[in-house]
Structure formats: structure tokens, C-alpha cells
Amino acid sequence: MDIFRLLTRGASVKKDPKNKNIGDAVENAKASNIEKNDKIAAENQITKELDFFHNKRIINKVNYNKAKETHAEDKEDKDNDNEEDEIKEEESLQYQKPLITNDEEAKLLRKSNKSNVSGEDIPLPIGSFEDLITRFSFDKRLLNNLILNHFTEPTPIQCEAIPLALNNRDMLACAPTGSGKTLAFLIPLIQQVINDKDTQGLKGLIISPTKELANQIFLECIKLSNRIFLDKKRPLQVALLSKSLSAKLRNKVISDKKYDIIVSTPLRLIDVVKNEALDLSQVKHLIFDEADKLFDKTFVEQSDDILSSCSHSSLRKSMFSATIPSNVEEIAKSIMMDPVRVIIGHKEAANTSIEQKLVFCGNEEGKLIAIKQLVQEGEFKPPVIIFLESITRAKALYHEMMYDSLNVDVIHAERTQVQRNKIIERFKSGDLWCLITTDVLARGVDFKGVNLVINYDVPRTAQAYVHRIGRTGRGGRSGKAVTFYTKEDSIAIKPIINVMKQSGSEISEWMEKVSKMTKKEKELVKKGRAHSERKQISTVPKIDKIKRKRKLEMIQASKKRKAIETKETE
């Protein structure tokens, strides 16, 4: 679709006596449309999305051509003339100078965006996507895809990360959840693949800790690379390294040079590389999304193997996350060449659009009562995500909530990928109101419009807390996060209170009086041992539990006696 057609969709023009034909066509339209068009024309205003290039004169001219085409569809020759006029307008378009042209303007923008950027020889940020056209010869097809998907202004992280990547700089980037980090690395990656169109084979590699996040990144990449051809016959190819694709690569059904960009989880990628089914030596752009997770003790060896396999001399490395612990910063310094550090807001803070709340429940039974109170008081507004610390507890809460006639389902690592995908689709479409899960869905997955996140169990670290509550308050929307805690969580909630303070959340008087964490407490939190083992989730009274246990023991004893008697008879 022509970018100017998109920009002028639904626009109208003033009636001009000189343009009698158009005036007559407008007069013949419905009265409601005439009134609407006259009002828009009289106000002579162009919306922010339509005035993408900040050039009303050109857009008004395109509006004129669009109106002429709309009201003379039956005349083919006029249609052709209009298209030619639009092409001429595009060719004659003179882009304005970039909005950020010097260090002083960059300083003001960074102050406004709360951006903290450190490193050597830092390029200027962008103030709009128009800057990309003037500074980097940005591909118009990619720009068109951005507009089609309603991305009209760069977010703070995109303002910094995109020019850094296009200048081939290594970077460590930290920005709040829902702030547009995925686009911050996808936009420059696609542009760099286009720039390197003469080279065939894998150029960009994106690593994600979970299958759900990898799939989400893949879908976003597909949207942005839609209808982009590197030559007349070869489209820009993006792949998600799934189980089936891995098998095809191993069996040589598909050439490892077919794809330009691959998105994968670490273990699956390493398996394919070790089987010599995929060559990473020509990868020029390596991106770690959720870097704090990919470089913790669970994934660090796998991430190191991937780094070793990407041996290109001009490899560009990027790390993105909502939280950056000090150990990840040290790793970044050791593996990157002259890196730039980008922090939007505070590196341990949550999204400021999320209302955060701590609720004392006394004990495990109190948590179930607290959920029922949220429902009764009207605060349980779907869609809702509830996080628990283990699969066993997630299953138990699911069975409890089923009896309350709530539209609920559960996702955890024991469910198959097909089951997980179906549940996620149901949740995204609104068929499912409440989703119970473990930390498997705490990172990166973008659920539009989640109103409430409940931490049924206190997260083990501040980083886990930030990522969990980051499932709400995304893309400029507001959200709410409620964390239940008991007396056993007295140490575990201290990092949560710190995050709330750094995020500017409303703090109760008792929170101000909470003592700072001791060295021993910090060590316990770091190891995930800040609270004792939790009791089983159940609404069944204690006396009934004892009766059930005795009954079960009696049944088992009876079965055992029968087995012995049968054996003696034989």
C-alpha cells in the first residue's frame, strides 16, 4: 500500500470553486458525510498520525488527489492520473531536518525521557521516525509497515537504541516493561538486513528465554518485514526455530542459508548448531532479549555457547531487559566491544503506569479469602493474571477457583506447547478471564489490556516482581498489581517495597518504617530462600483434612491386607 494513501485515508478537503467537478461530487454525497467533511476542512487540522512527516502542505495536496480519486472511481483514466500525481508528490517530497541535530537538543530529549546513556562517542538519539529517513536512509517499505501497525512515534528506549544499533554499536539496554523494547531491536535489525541484501544467509539472531516470548518476537518481526524484498524474487525471510524447523534443518530439507533472521530459545539453537545443521559464523547481529534471565545460572552456559558459535569479526551484540542486575552488567562489559549503556528510568523500577499494592493476608487461607474479597468489591476486573511460585501451587489454586464459577485456566511447564498456545489465544481473545500461571509467563509476553496482576506468592527477587507486574500497564495503558504476603514473607517483601518506592508508588506509613535489608537478608533473597516452605492451598477445614487422611490410610491398609490374603491363598 502506498504510504501517502495510508496517510490520507478518511481525509477530506475544502470545497474550492475552481474545482467544480469535485465540489459537485461532494454535494451528491450523504448529508452526514458533507457535514463531517466540511467540519474537518474548516478546522484545517491534521491528526498526529496523519501528519507523520510534519508537512501539511504536502498532505493537503495528497488529500486533494485522494478526493478526486474517490469521487471518480468509474473513470479509469482519472484514477491513473491520480496515482501518477501521488508518485510525483512522493518523489518531490523534501524531508525536514531531523528533530535532534545537536547535543543540546539530545540533552533536552533525554531529560524528558528520563534516559541515562553512558559510553564513548554516543550517537544522537532520534526524536521521531522522520530522523531515521534523514540520517540513515531508512527503507520506506519498513516505514510503511510501522505506520500500518500504528507505530507513529518512537518510545524513549527506541529513541536511543535504534540509532545505536544502526551505528553498529554494542549496547546494554534497560527499560520498563511494555515500553517498546522489542521494536527497539527489531527495527534496526530489519534495516541492517536490507542494507546487507547482497549477502545471502543468516545475519540476525534473537535469543529469548521462553517459547512464548520467542513466538511473540517472531510475529512482530513478520509484521515489520511484510512485503520487503531483498531483490526481485527474494523476500526477507524470518523464522522461529521450532521443533519441526529444527528437524528440517538437520535432515537438510531446508538450507541453513534460507533465513535472514532467526528467533530461538537457547537450548533448541545449541542442539541444531551442535548437529551442524545451522552455521552461525556469518551472524552479524546477536540480540539477547530478557538478558538478565539469559545470563543467570540457568542459562549462562547456553548463552556462552551461542556467543562462541557467533564468530563473525564484526558481530554486534545487544542485551535488552526490564531489569539489569550488577552481574549481568559485568558480563556485558566482558563480552562487548566499547558498549553503550542505556537506562530508561531506574534499572530496578517498575512501570510508573502500574498502581502497586501490598495486601497482608495473615496466612495461606487468608489469600483465598483476599481473592474472594477482590471479586466481591469489584476490583477483580478481567483480564487478570495470577502468579504463583510453583506448578503444584498453581494447579491447587486452579482447582479452588474453578468451584467459584470463575472463567479460569492454568499454564505451567508441565502443559504441552499446543495446550499453552491454545490457552494464551483464548486469554488474548477474551474467552478466558483469568489466567493462573508460574513465572513461565512472567517475561516479555505482551497481553493487551490486562487490568490486574495478582502475586499470590511473593516473588523471590525484585527482578521477578518487576517482570511479573509488567504484564499489565503496557503500551501506555494503566494497570494494577496486588501482592499478597503473610508473616513468613517479612524479609521477601523488602525488595518489593524498594521497587515501589523507586517507581513512585504510593507508600503506606508502615512501609517507610521497614528496616533496610541486612547483608544476611540480601543473601537469602539472592538465593531465593527469603521465606519458609508454604502450606498447601485449600479451603477445606483442618478437621476435614484429618478425616480425609485417616480415610485414605484405612483404604490403603485394607488394600494391603487383601493383597497379603490373596498371596497366602495362592
From Swiss-Prot:
<dbReference type="GO" id="GO:0000480">
    <property type="term" value="P:endonucleolytic cleavage in 5'-ETS of tricistronic rRNA transcript (SSU-rRNA, 5.8S rRNA, LSU-rRNA)"/>
</dbReference>
<dbReference type="InterPro" id="IPR001650">
    <property type="entry name" value="Helicase_C-like"/>
</dbReference>
<keyword id="KW-0347">Helicase</keyword>
<dbReference type="GO" id="GO:0005524">
    <property type="term" value="F:ATP binding"/>
</dbReference>
<dbReference type="InterPro" id="IPR044764">
    <property type="entry name" value="DDX52/Rok1_DEADc"/>
</dbReference>
<feature type="domain" description="Helicase ATP-binding">
    <location>
        <begin position="162"/>
        <end position="342"/>
    </location>
</feature>
<protein>
    <recommendedName>
        <fullName>ATP-dependent RNA helicase ROK1</fullName>
        <ecNumber>3.6.4.13</ecNumber>
    </recommendedName>
</protein>
<dbReference type="InterPro" id="IPR000629">
    <property type="entry name" value="RNA-helicase_DEAD-box_CS"/>
</dbReference>
<comment type="similarity">
    <text>Belongs to the DEAD box helicase family. DDX52/ROK1 subfamily.</text>
</comment>
<dbReference type="GO" id="GO:0005829">
    <property type="term" value="C:cytosol"/>
</dbReference>
<dbReference type="InterPro" id="IPR014001">
    <property type="entry name" value="Helicase_ATP-bd"/>
</dbReference>
<feature type="domain" description="Helicase C-terminal">
    <location>
        <begin position="353"/>
        <end position="515"/>
    </location>
</feature>
<dbReference type="GO" id="GO:0000472">
    <property type="term" value="P:endonucleolytic cleavage to generate mature 5'-end of SSU-rRNA from (SSU-rRNA, 5.8S rRNA, LSU-rRNA)"/>
</dbReference>
<dbReference type="GO" id="GO:0005730">
    <property type="term" value="C:nucleolus"/>
</dbReference>
<dbReference type="InterPro" id="IPR050079">
    <property type="entry name" value="DEAD_box_RNA_helicase"/>
</dbReference>
<dbReference type="InterPro" id="IPR027417">
    <property type="entry name" value="P-loop_NTPase"/>
</dbReference>
<dbReference type="GO" id="GO:0003724">
    <property type="term" value="F:RNA helicase activity"/>
</dbReference>
<keyword id="KW-0067">ATP-binding</keyword>
<keyword id="KW-0698">rRNA processing</keyword>
<feature type="short sequence motif" description="Q motif">
    <location>
        <begin position="131"/>
        <end position="159"/>
    </location>
</feature>
<feature type="compositionally biased region" description="Acidic residues">
    <location>
        <begin position="79"/>
        <end position="89"/>
    </location>
</feature>
<comment type="subunit">
    <text>Interacts with the U3 snoRNA and is associated with the 90S and 40S pre-ribosomes.</text>
</comment>
<keyword id="KW-0547">Nucleotide-binding</keyword>
<dbReference type="GO" id="GO:0032040">
    <property type="term" value="C:small-subunit processome"/>
</dbReference>
<comment type="function">
    <text>ATP-dependent RNA helicase involved in 40S ribosomal subunit biogenesis. Required for the processing and cleavage of 35S pre-rRNA at sites A0, A1, and A2, leading to mature 18S rRNA.</text>
</comment>
<dbReference type="GO" id="GO:0003723">
    <property type="term" value="F:RNA binding"/>
</dbReference>
<dbReference type="GO" id="GO:0000447">
    <property type="term" value="P:endonucleolytic cleavage in ITS1 to separate SSU-rRNA from 5.8S rRNA and LSU-rRNA from tricistronic rRNA transcript (SSU-rRNA, 5.8S rRNA, LSU-rRNA)"/>
</dbReference>
<feature type="short sequence motif" description="DEAD box">
    <location>
        <begin position="289"/>
        <end position="292"/>
    </location>
</feature>
<dbReference type="Pfam" id="PF00270">
    <property type="entry name" value="DEAD"/>
</dbReference>
<feature type="binding site">
    <location>
        <begin position="175"/>
        <end position="182"/>
    </location>
    <ligand>
        <name>ATP</name>
    </ligand>
</feature>
<feature type="region of interest" description="Disordered">
    <location>
        <begin position="69"/>
        <end position="96"/>
    </location>
</feature>
<dbReference type="GO" id="GO:0048254">
    <property type="term" value="P:snoRNA localization"/>
</dbReference>
<keyword id="KW-0694">RNA-binding</keyword>
<keyword id="KW-0539">Nucleus</keyword>
<keyword id="KW-0690">Ribosome biogenesis</keyword>
<keyword id="KW-0378">Hydrolase</keyword>
<dbReference type="Pfam" id="PF00271">
    <property type="entry name" value="Helicase_C"/>
</dbReference>
<dbReference type="GO" id="GO:0016887">
    <property type="term" value="F:ATP hydrolysis activity"/>
</dbReference>
<dbReference type="InterPro" id="IPR011545">
    <property type="entry name" value="DEAD/DEAH_box_helicase_dom"/>
</dbReference>
<feature type="compositionally biased region" description="Basic and acidic residues">
    <location>
        <begin position="69"/>
        <end position="78"/>
    </location>
</feature>
